């Protein structure tokens, strides 16, 4: 009996020691994984408080297939030993091929996002993915991430538009996966026309456009569908996380960015303006954005069709995001980035495919069409920033201009003032000149007791090219200035004719200082009233073609 008891005690002791060792080993492994995750988060540069990373569960574990042989699909296009992994796709295909098509990724959303709830009757969407010679591993991972991380009821179909890839089976074999459909172009059409083709056959009321080298994150679709369901004129985009082109690490992007651009129509990510940051108390609220990157967004199909889809005369890729963004804002819609929606994207440093007319010429053609249709008089700044566009062919835009008129879209000036006031209008300075009426010239006439320059009319002296300082005016875009002071109306109301015109410290954003030439008139841009001479002062008055006091010569002409 003693022997049995001793053996039992020995067995229990060994079991306790082994159990303790296993517990400590597991605990240490969990802490190591957590530390590794936090390090990756900092590397991604996400400006949020530190928290434990969450690995996303798969909603569907292993996408059911109808005879789809994943191993055969991927192995058919694997790299040969010694082959450059960057050559064909401009990212490390070797690293992509190593990864599972169902790989887990980090939940990069703000910690408040999981607590949000969405409508139980969100509309289903057609996901449209266009590609040309995409790596099979990234294309498959894009498709499976959508199916694995989206409730099945929200995905009506995934439409793959194969833009004349070298191997038709890149697309066709994927149709063995449920909900996946394949359209193949019989010639190279480019992303823009391929997307239109996919949208035309889509059966859902909402369209979701994705690039072919993405991985969607947890609850990526629900917050975007919610915004579109609440207002069908919204076009919404996720925060676009970064998938490294070198090792395919999934890195969190900043939640404080929006889309912007310069006058050459070059897209850039920029910080949300400070005043918007100050009023932004809820990090889950959508961010207004002047433009979207264009690769990933959700739009109501009827709204997409109403707006005129894409400009089908644009070629291959580039510039279509500006054309769509201007059209949405100026024709009654809005653009948003939804912070609780995250999608990873492989950003490449070069295009892995050829443009029939070359990358630069294609981009010029597309952006020039955008400028000619949507930028009104501000298109001059596009040409100044991109002089290589001058004289380049861009096709007819008559139908696009007519469509804009039919939709009664707002002006580009409205867009700058209401959507993107942060885009500074370039100041185009010219040589000093005079503002002449008969034999008299507009001049500053000393200062008052407050130090303000006084305005009046005096006999012209000197010449237009070399006037005296008091009669020398600098004509810049919408500003008439002298010695750092600008001509300003005291009222911007059309109902206030007779308001005095004074000189103020120049402020390019001040509407009271905005003027334009209209024939021989100098017209106030905001009120529409005209500059007129009175015996003792200058005023703004209702424009009258027979009013000699409103007729001006600007020498030299700008």
UniProtKB/Swiss-Prot annotation:
- Point to the regions of Low complexity compositional bias: 34-46
Instruction: Supply the enzyme class, top level.
Output: transferase
Keyword Nucleotide-binding present in the record's keywords: the answer is no
Pfam families associated with the record = Glycos_transf_2, Ricin_B_lectin
Q: In which tissues is it expressed?
A: In the CNS, it is predominantly expressed in several distinct hypothalamic, thalamic and amygdaloid nuclei. The most abundant level of expression is in the paraventricular, ventromedial and arcuate nuclei of the hypothalamus, the anterodorsal and parafascicular nuclei of the thalamus and the central, basomedial and medial nuclei of the amygdala. Also expressed in cerebral cortex, lateral septum, habenula and hippocampus.
Q: Which InterPro entries match?
A: GalNAc-T, Glyco_trans_2-like, Nucleotide-diphossugar_trans, Ricin_B-like_lectins, Ricin_B_lectin
Region annotation (Catalytic subdomain B) ranges: 286-348
Cofactor(s) needed: Mn(2+)
Output the SUPFAM superfamilies linked to this UniProt entry. Answer: Nucleotide-diphospho-sugar transferases, Ricin B-like lectins
Q: Which UniProt keywords apply?
A: Disulfide bond, Glycosyltransferase, Golgi apparatus, Lectin, Manganese, Membrane, Metal-binding, Signal-anchor, Transferase, Transmembrane, Transmembrane helix
Q: Which reaction does it catalyse?
A: L-seryl-[protein] + UDP-N-acetyl-alpha-D-galactosamine = a 3-O-[N-acetyl-alpha-D-galactosaminyl]-L-seryl-[protein] + UDP + H(+); L-threonyl-[protein] + UDP-N-acetyl-alpha-D-galactosamine = a 3-O-[N-acetyl-alpha-D-galactosaminyl]-L-threonyl-[protein] + UDP + H(+)
Span of domain Ricin B-type lectin: 428-555
The molecular function terms of the Gene Ontology recorded here are: carbohydrate binding; metal ion binding; polypeptide N-acetylgalactosaminyltransferase activity
Which positions in this protein are listed as binding Mn(2+)? 211, 213, 345
Tell me the disulfide pairings in this chain: 113-340, 331-409, 441-460, 486-506, 530-543
As for what it does, the entry says:
Catalyzes the initial reaction in O-linked oligosaccharide biosynthesis, the transfer of an N-acetyl-D-galactosamine residue to a serine or threonine residue on the protein receptor.
User: Under which name does UniProt file this protein?
Assistant: Polypeptide N-acetylgalactosaminyltransferase 16
């Amino acid at each position: 009996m003693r022997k049995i008891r001793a053996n039992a005690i020995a067995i229990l002791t060994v079991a306790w020691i082994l159990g303790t060792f296993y517990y400590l080993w597991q605990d240490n492994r969990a802490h190591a994984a957590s530390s590794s995750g936090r390090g990756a988060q900092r590397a991604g540069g996400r400006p949020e408080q530190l928290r434990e990373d969450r690995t996303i569960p798969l909603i569907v574990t292993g996408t059911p297939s109808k005879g789809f042989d994943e191993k055969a699909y991927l192995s058919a296009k694997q790299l040969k030993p010694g082959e450059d992994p960057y050559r064909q796709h401009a990212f490390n295909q070797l690293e992509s091929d190593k990864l599972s098509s169902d790989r887990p990724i980090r939940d990069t959303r703000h910690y408040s996002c999981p607590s949000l709830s969405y409508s139980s009757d969100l509309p289903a969407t057609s996901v449209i993915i266009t590609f040309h010679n995409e790596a099979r591993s990234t294309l498959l991972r894009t498709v499976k991430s959508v199916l694995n991380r989206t409730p099945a009821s929200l995905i009506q179909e995934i439409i793959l538009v194969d833009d004349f890839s070298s191997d038709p089976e890149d697309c066709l074999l994927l149709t063995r996966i449920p909900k996946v459909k394949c359209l193949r172009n019989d010639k190279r059409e480019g992303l823009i026309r391929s997307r239109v083709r996919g949208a035309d056959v889509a059966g859902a009321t909402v369209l979701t456009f994705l690039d072919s080298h993405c991985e969607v994150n947890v609850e990526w679709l629900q917050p975007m569908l919610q915004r579109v369901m609440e207002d069908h004129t919204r076009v919404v985009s996720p925060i676009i996380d970064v998938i490294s082109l070198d090792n395919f690490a999934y890195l969190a992007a900043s939640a404080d960015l929006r889309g912007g651009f310069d006058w050459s129509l070059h897209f850039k990510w920029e910080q949300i303006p400070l005043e918007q940051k100050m009023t932004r108390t809820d990090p889950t609220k959508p961010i207004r954005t002047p433009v979207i990157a264009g690769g990933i967004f959700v739009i109501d199909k009827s709204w997409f069709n109403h707006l005129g889809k894409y400009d089908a005369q644009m070629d291959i890729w580039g510039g279509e995001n500006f054309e769509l963004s201007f059209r949405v804002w100026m024709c009654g819609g809005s653009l948003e980035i939804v912070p609780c929606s995250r999608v990873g994207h492989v950003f490449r440093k070069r295009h892995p495919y050829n443009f029939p007319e070359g990358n630069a010429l294609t981009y010029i053609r597309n952006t020039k069409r955008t400028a000619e249709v949507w930028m009104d008089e501000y298109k001059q700044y596009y040409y100044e920033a991109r002089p290589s566009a001058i004289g380049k062919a861009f096709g007819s835009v008559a139908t696009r201009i007519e469509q804009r008129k039919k939709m009664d879209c707002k002006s580009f000036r409205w867009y700058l003032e209401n959507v993107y006031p942060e885009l500074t209008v370039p100041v185009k300075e010219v040589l000093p000149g005079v503002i002449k009426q008969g034999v008299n010239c507009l001049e500053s006439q000393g200062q008052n007791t407050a130090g303000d320059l006084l305005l009046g009319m005096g006999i012209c002296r000197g010449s237009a090219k070399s006037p005296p300082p008091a009669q020398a005016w600098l004509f810049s875009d919408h500003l008439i200035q002298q010695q750092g002071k600008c001509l300003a109306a005291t009222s911007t109301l059309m109902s206030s004719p007779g308001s005095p015109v004074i000189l103020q410290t120049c402020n390019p954003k001040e509407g009271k200082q905005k003027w334009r030439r209209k024939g021989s008139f100098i017209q106030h841009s905001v009120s529409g009233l005209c500059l007129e001479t009175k015996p003792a002062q200058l005023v703004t008055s209702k424009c009258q073609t027979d009013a000699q006091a409103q007729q001006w010569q600007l020498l030299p002409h700008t």
